[in-house]
Amino acid sequence: MVESEDWLIVGKLVGAQGLQGELRVNPASDFPERFTTPGSRWLRGRKGGEPKEVQLKKGRQLPGKSLFILRLEGIDSRDAAEALVGQELLVPASDRPELEEGEFHLLDLVGLEARLHADEPAIGVVTDLISGGNDLLELKTSAGRTLLIPFVESIVPEVHLEKGWLLLTPPPGLLDL
């Protein structure tokens, strides 16, 4: 069995879709094949615990939304689907796609320090990544505030995974919200 620290959260089950047991998933992955290619996936309950293996039969993206619709083996009613809402969809960390030089996995940003200048102390730490039209970094400042920072190149021009920090060049007022 894969150890708990060796799992990647690739999505969260957020609702039932229709009456036939399909599930809506909010993705936490930039790789759509994690939701469309049949095969083994794992679910972990709202309170943690040991992941349970499930079989993805098929999946598709919901048109016009960032959500995916999944059909899991053995889940064939709305009630069965609703019982899974809130669980995390997992894959083994060993399933991470190989990246090119200079590329990184978005989930690797969590825990990085955020700096306004390379040679200055951090203003906070990235605590979460929120997927949407544009990904948002959730930043906890050293003053205890929580900020949402658009993860776009003009605002986050540099990411230094090996050094544990990223550079922010926010427009005026963004950090004051």
UniProtKB/Swiss-Prot annotation:
The keyword Cell inner membrane does not apply. One of its GO terms (biological process) is ribosomal small subunit biogenesis. GO terms for cellular component: cytoplasm; ribosome. Coiled coil: none annotated. Binds ribosomal protein uS19. An accessory protein needed during the final step in the assembly of 30S ribosomal subunit, possibly for assembly of the head region. Essential for efficient processing of 16S rRNA. May be needed both before and after RbfA during the maturation of 16S rRNA. It has affinity for free ribosomal 30S subunits but not for 70S ribosomes. The PRC barrel domain binds ribosomal protein uS19. This is Ribosome maturation factor RimM.
